[in-house]
Amino acid sequence: IFLVLAIGVADTVHILSGYLFFRNHGESHEEALRSVFRKTALACMLTSITTMIGMFSLLLVPIKPIQSFGLFSGIGVFIAFLLTVFVLPLMLDLWSPYAKNPKASLTKKKHRLDDDGQRMHFVQSILRKVEPLSYRFPLAVTLSFVLAAVILAYGITKVKIDTNMVNIIKEGQPMRTTYNLVDRFMGGSGSAEILVNTGKIDGLKDPRILNAMDDLQIFVKNEFPHLVTKSTSLVNISKDSFKALNEGQDSMYVIPDDPGILANTLFMFNNANPKERRRMVTDDYSLGRISVNLRNSGSQEYNDMIFRIHNFADRRFAELKSDYPKLKVRVTGTLAMLSQMTDYISWSQVRSFGLALIVISLLLLLVFSSYRAGMVALLPNIFPVLTIFGIMGYLEISLDTDTLLVAPITIGIAVDDTIHFLTNYRAEVSKHGNIKEGIIKTFRETGQAITFTSIILSIGFLIFLMSSHQGLSNFGIMSAIAFFTALLADLFLLPSMCLLFNVRFKSETANLKEAVK
C-alpha cells in the first residue's frame, strides 16, 4: 500500500508543480491546467506504463507472493494514473491554490512565494546553482559518471547470488534466535537427503553398495565439517547390528564382507525394529537414503556442497555401474530443494529485469522517434542499477530473492523522471531549436518536481526499514539509494548527454514547412 502510494503520488507532484509554475507566471486557473496537461499528460502516461512494465515483469518470478506483489502494484499504478488525470483537475477546480481572478493571482503570487512557497523557493534556488554544471561542463560531468560507473562495475564482479533463509531475518528476532540455538545445541536446523537407488531388488544388501555409501558419508563429514553435524543411513544400522550380534566388540563395528551375513544382520534388525528400518530403506532394499543434519548456511554454499557430493558419488559408484546399470545417487530433501529454488527464483528475477529493460528501451525509442534520444534516456537509468549492485559488491551484501527485486522495480520507476525531463526538453527544443535554452527551461519547469518525486519515492521505500525481515530492509534502503542516484543522473548526466550527443528535435517551423510541402 505504501509502495503504491509513493509511486502514485509522483505524477500528482509533476502536475501540481507544473500547475504552480504556470500560475506563478501569471496564467489563469484554466490556462495553467491546459498548459500543464499539454506538457505533462503524455509524460505521465508513459511513466505509468514504464512503472507498470517494471512491476508486471515480476510475474516472471515463479513464486506467488512476488507475482501478487507485481500484479497488484501494477494495477495500483494504473488506477493512480486514472485518478491523477481525471480526479485531480476536478479537485483543483474545487480547491485552487490561487484566487480565480488573474490580477488577484498575480498579487497573491509574490506573497505565496515569500511565505507558503518558501520551501519551493529553497529547492529552486539550489537547482539554479547546480543547473549551469550540465551545460557549462558537459564533458567533465559525463566523464565523472563514466568513471563512477567503471568503479561500480568492478564492485558488481564481487556480487554473488546467495539466499540465506535465516540471515534474511533481523538479529534479535525470536525466529532467528531459535534457529541459532538449534544450530548450536540441537544438531542443526536443516537437513538434506541423499538417495541411493540401485535399480535392483536387494541391491542394498550388497556390501559393496554399503561400503560406497559409507565412503560417501565420510566424504560429506570431512569435506563440510562446519555444515554437517551428523549423517545416518542403512550403513549405521548394519554396523550397529553387526556389533551387537558380536557381543559389542568395537572391532565388529564394520559392514560384513559376506553378503549372506549382511543379509542376516539386516533381517535381525528388521525383526527388532521394522519402523526404523523403513525410515532408511524400502521394503525391497532397492532404494536407501542417507539423512544428513546441517547447520544453517546460504544457498550458494549448499549448492556447492550438492555439486561436490554428486561428483564424488559419480566417481565412487562408477565401479558398480556394470552390476547396477540403473544405479543413481542424488541429493534431495527440503533444504536441497529450497536452496535450488531460491537460486532459480533469483535467476528468474534477473530475466525479469532483462525483460523490463528491453521493453522500456523499445518504448523510449518508439516515443522519442530517435535512436539517439532513446539511448540518452536509457543510460542514466542504468546508472542507479550499477550503483546498487556495485555497492552491494563492495559491502559483500549478497543478492537474494528480496534485493533482486530492486533492479526491475528501480528501472521501471526511475525512468519516470527521465521521461518527464525529456518530454519537456523535446517541447522546448522543438519550439526554439536551442539545446542550452531547452535545458535551462526544462530544469526550471521540471527540476523541482523531479527532486520532490525522488524524495517521496525514497521515503516511501525507506518504510521497509521498519520490517523485521532483513531482506525487505535491504530492499528498501537499496531502492532509496537507487532513486537518489537516479535523481543525480537526471539532473546532471542527462542534460550533459543531451548537449554532447546533440539531441535535438525538429522545430515547429520545420514541421510546418514539411506539412505544407
Stretches found by the model and what they are:
Residues 137-401, 499, 503-517:
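Extracytoplasmic
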Residues 19, 37, 41, 49, ...:
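Hydrophobic residues within alpha-helical transmembrane segments
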Residues 30-37, 120-133, 334-341, 436, ...:
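Cytosolic juxtamembrane amphipathic/interface segments immediately preceding
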Residues 5-7, 13-27, 35, 56-60, ...:
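Helix-loop junctions at the membrane interface of multi-pass solute transporters
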Residues 1-15, 373-422, 462, 492-493, ...:
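Hydrophobic transmembrane alpha-helices and their membrane-interface caps
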Residues 45-88, 361-365, 387-398, 447-505:
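Hydrophobic, glycine/alanine-rich multi-pass transmembrane helices and their short helix-loop junctions
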Residues 22-49, 429-452:
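Helix-loop junctions and hydrophobic alpha-helical segments within the transmembrane domains
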Residues 34, 82-149, 430, 495-517:
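Interfacial helix-loop-helix hairpins and adjacent transmembrane helices
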